[in-house]
Amino acid sequence: MTYAARVDGLAGVHAMNAQLLGDTEYMSKVTAGAALGGGPAEDNLLRPLHGELGDPPPAGSVATVTTAVVANGAYADAVVWGIEMAQLVESIAGTPTIFGMNAFGTFGQVTWINISADTAAADAAGEATNNSADYMGRLSAIGDLFLPGSGHRSLAIRVA
């Protein structure tokens, strides 16, 4: 399960946490919910390098989240490639894509977040992207930009 919030950097995280940690009702829900999780909570902060956040997407929208960890010595090239891939996916799928790098969380991790209106639109975007010769060609030419085996794709559906 993922909880996401838009903040302005570390100061925004601090201000949000101060407010939440001071709310006894929130803290009792966190304590009760801890038994439902598979492990401790993990904080991440993504600094967008490409794409516009815009308004929060509506309930039922789908975020396809792809992550990878940049190989040592490949940061500049990986960021350029990541931005180009985000732009390519936007042009193929017709959906907004955010690309960013972790400010904290897994060191060197980059993330692409593609937002679709619903599950049908997410399926269509994925099919269009995977059927693109340009997209597949760029993936095939990725070289040593990322650590082998570090790629991961997940899906998040907005419920509220």
Q: Model features per residue range: what roles?
A:
Residues M1-A160:
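Short S/T/G/P-rich N-terminal loop/turn motif that feeds into the first structured element of a domain
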